[in-house]
Curated annotation (Swiss-Prot):
May have a role in the cell cycle. InterPro entries: EHR_sf, ERH. This is Enhancer of rudimentary homolog. It comes from the Eukaryota. It comes from Sus scrofa (Pig). One of its GO terms (molecular function) is methyl-CpG binding.
Amino acid sequence: RADTQTYQPYNKDWIKEKIYVLLRRQAQQAGK
């Protein structure tokens, strides 16, 4: 599975995870 993710770095799950982390960072900054 690692090879698949490396071959297709822009997976739906990958994008979801990136967006999720991004939103969490923004939420934390806004909370502070």
